UniProtKB/Swiss-Prot annotation:
The gene is fabZ. This is 3-hydroxyacyl-[acyl-carrier-protein] dehydratase FabZ. The lineage of its organism: Bacteria, Pseudomonadati, Pseudomonadota, Gammaproteobacteria, Pseudomonadales. Involved in unsaturated fatty acids biosynthesis. Catalyzes the dehydration of short chain beta-hydroxyacyl-ACPs and long chain saturated and unsaturated beta-hydroxyacyl-ACPs. It comes from the Bacteria. GO terms for cellular component: cytoplasm; membrane. It holds the Pfam family FabA. Its EC number is 4.2.1.59.
Length: 145
């Protein structure tokens, strides 16, 4: 899935679209693998931190949630243009393991865990060069708009 198709399934736009490409999306296996190329040109590096730039943890979480959202949209067979959005509403078991720096490729993986009455749960991981960066269970709420 290239950036044009990603933009069909995610309502986010610059500077908040945090998925560059999907390399695997398997609806039957209920999993997605994607990545974000992190460059020094990201607007958040101006203030976080100019002399020692690292990607804010909340944006790593958001990137994982966006990957999970892509999986959710594909599993349901809908797009935001159909009148449905998935809102990030929480996380469980959140852990950060190492910082993400300019030049890193942030690999995002999400596996579907459950959907109960429109509350979706995904097991998400972010890695750089195969090393764990962040992991969490991401919780999203399905909402018609």
């Amino acid at each position: 899935m290239d950036i044009n198709e990603i933009r069909e399934y995610l309502p986010h736009r610059y500077p908040f679209l945090l998925v560059d490409r999907v390399t695997e999306l398997d609806v039957e296996a209920k999993r997605v693998r994607a990545y974000k190329n992190v460059t020094i040109n990201e607007p958040f590096f101006n203030g976080h931190f100019p002399q020692h730039p690292i990607m804010p943890g909340v944006l790593i979480i958001e990137a994982m949630a966006q990957a999970a959202g892509l999986l959710g949209f594909k599993m349901m067979g809908v797009k935001p243009s159909d009148g449905t959005l998935y809102y990030f509403v929480g996380s469980d078991k959140l852990r950060f393991r190492q910082p993400v720096r300019p030049g890193d490729q942030l690999v995002l993986e999400a596996d579907f865990l459950s959907n109960k009455r429109g509350i979706w749960k995904f097991d998400c991981r972010a890695t750089v060069d195969g090393r764990p960066v962040c992991s969490a269970e991401i919780i999203c709420a399905e909402q018609e708009i």
